[in-house]
């Protein structure tokens, strides 16, 4: 069973303040609809050649697509140096002749370097933007004017999970990647401890969903994380063993916790539009 605490320690408040000061003000109003550009990328794939994509999900991106939405690559403003990895967006294009009103849900799993295009979309996502029979016309356009907003991720029956990265080496060198982070929140801090111990040790963010520690405790491990967004935050952890003592690189472990929170925002009223 997952345990959620809303009591914020003084150390967490310092972390939150530091995070807020380094985050662009606009990110606090993520429920607002924004205008941008999206382009078609025939090469965008759940299994990008030569690696795991700009977020490093690799083959797990295919699972995220099946459970969360179509795959998308985000530009610098969306990717945010990896902090945007795994975020979910609702998007529709603005050409009334060929674009559907409902649009599509996408999951950010890759990065592209252009500042002129906010998103690159693969074939399925691009086709989903179009009215029936109009996808071929959309693909002929260089870039589409789109409306988009961040929305809560919903991975259906998936709990927050941990992928032990291949570069990990037992017992002390541990690198993990979070998968299936639901809701509309960000992970700000991660601690690890041996099951039954109160000796929590902090992990360091490598980028986006990847965290590491070179002095991981021995034995079966438990985790806790500060999940925050806007001005709201809480500790989240599973009150059970997450990684066994003989954890293996390349394996995925279920934390048993599920995040469904939508962090409150301090921004002023903004356009939300009707997305029916």
Swiss-Prot record:
One of its GO terms (cellular component) is extracellular region. Keywords: Glycoprotein, Secreted, Signal. PROSITE patterns: EXPANSIN_CBD, EXPANSIN_EG45. GO terms for biological process: plant-type cell wall loosening. Glycans are attached at residues 115, 159. Pfam families: Expansin_C. Coiled coil: none annotated. Transmembrane segments: none annotated. Residues 52-158 form the Expansin-like EG45 domain. Induction: By gibberellin (GA3). Residues 1-28 form the signal peptide. It comes from the Eukaryota. It is found in: Secreted. Residues 172-255 form the Expansin-like CBD domain. SUPFAM superfamilies: Barwin-like endoglucanases, PHL pollen allergen. The keyword Translocase does not apply. Belongs to the expansin family. Expansin-like A subfamily. This is Expansin-like A3. The gene is EXLA3.
């Amino acid at each position: 069973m997952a345990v959620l605490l809303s009591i914020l320690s003084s150390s967490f408040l310092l972390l939150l303040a530091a995070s807020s000061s380094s985050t662009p003000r606009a990110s606090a109003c993520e429920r607002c609809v924004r205008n941008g550009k999206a382009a078609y990328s025939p090469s965008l794939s759940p299994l990008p050649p030569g690696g795991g994509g700009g977020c490093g999900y690799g083959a797990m991106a295919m699972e995220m697509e099946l459970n969360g939405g179509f795959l998308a690559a985000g530009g610098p403003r969306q990717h945010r140096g990896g902090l945007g990895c795994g975020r979910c967006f609702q998007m529709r294009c603005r050409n009334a002749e060929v674009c559907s009103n409902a649009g599509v849900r996408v999951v950010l799993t890759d990065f592209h370097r252009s500042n002129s295009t906010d998103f690159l979309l693969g074939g399925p996502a691009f086709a989903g933007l179009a009215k029936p029979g109009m996808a071929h016309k959309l693909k002929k356009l260089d870039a589409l004017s789109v409306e988009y907003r961040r929305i809560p991720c919903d991975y259906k029956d998936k709990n927050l999970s941990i992928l032990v990265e291949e570069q990990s080496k037992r017992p002390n060198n541990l690198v993990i990647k979070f998968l299936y982070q639901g809701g509309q929140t960000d992970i700000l801090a991660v601690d690890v401890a041996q099951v039954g111990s109160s000796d929590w040790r902090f992990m360091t963010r490598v980028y986006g969903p990847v965290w590491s520690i070179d002095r991981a405790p021995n034995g079966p491990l438990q985790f806790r994380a500060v999940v925050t967004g806007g001005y709201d935050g809480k500790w989240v952890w599973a009150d059970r063993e997450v990684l066994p003592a003989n954890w293996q690189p390349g394996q995925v472990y279920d934390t048993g916790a599920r995040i469904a929170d939508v962090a409150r925002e301090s921004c002023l009223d903004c356009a939300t539009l009707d997305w029916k």
